[in-house]
Amino acid sequence: MTGLTNRTVVIDGRGHLLGRLASVVAKYLLQGGKVAVVRCEELNLSGHFYRNKIKFLAYLRKRCNVNPARGPFHFRAPSRIFYKAVRGMIPHKTKRGQAALARLRVFDGIPSPYDKRRRVVVPIAMRVLTLRSDRKYCQVGRLSHEVGWHYQDVIKSLERKRKAKLRVTLKHNRELKKLTVKARENIAKAAEPFNKIIKSYGYEV
């Protein structure tokens, strides 16, 4: 993530450990970068699922005893869980921290326009590279679903539609590429004298 630009870095959350990814994202935001994290429901948590569920249910019980409507408010959506993890690593009560958080976007699934953008991964936060193969882990999406998040089926449906649309697009692009190669072969002999002239001026054909 070196070389800051105004362009938003789109990170695919699938297969990343939540805390490790949050620390990398928090540091990048404080350096002035813009980040969008998609597919937060496929982030991973190390440890057995039931252990993580018990911890999260204990976290949900932390509320104002006099009037629970005062807060604190505990979000169930995977994207908001990740957002809060990042927020905890940033001085969010200062102007600098607020500006950093304003540069963060988090999403469940891959909404438009990020479905057409190049997505990257963070190797130092990926589960397959950082967690021992015999260690237990669980998905944030499953945890969220079991503690009150109601949109797991909606996100899965939207993801199926997106992947079906992507398969059609890729098939069309492959066919177009074949036609382009065939067209070049068909005109190769006729275009040879023109290519020589272009090359004489120092251009590559």
UniProtKB/Swiss-Prot annotation:
Q: Which GO terms describe its cellular component?
A: cytosolic large ribosomal subunit; cytosolic ribosome; ribosome
The source's superkingdom equals Eukaryota
Does Ribosomal protein show up as a keyword for this record? yes
From its record, what is one biological process in GO terms? Answer: cytoplasmic translation
Q: Which UniProt keywords apply?
A: Ribonucleoprotein, Ribosomal protein
Record's Pfam families? Ribosomal_L13 (PF00572)
Q: Where are the transmembrane segments?
A: none
Record-linked InterPro entries: Ribosomal_uL13, Ribosomal_uL13_CS, Ribosomal_uL13_euk/arc, Ribosomal_uL13_sf
Which GO MF terms are attached to this record? mRNA binding; structural constituent of ribosome
Recorded hits in SUPFAM superfamilies, A to Z, give:
Ribosomal protein L13
State the similarity comment.
Belongs to the universal ribosomal protein uL13 family.
Identify this protein by name: Large ribosomal subunit protein uL13
Q: Which organism is it from?
A: Drosophila melanogaster (Fruit fly)
Q: Which gene encodes it?
A: RpL13A
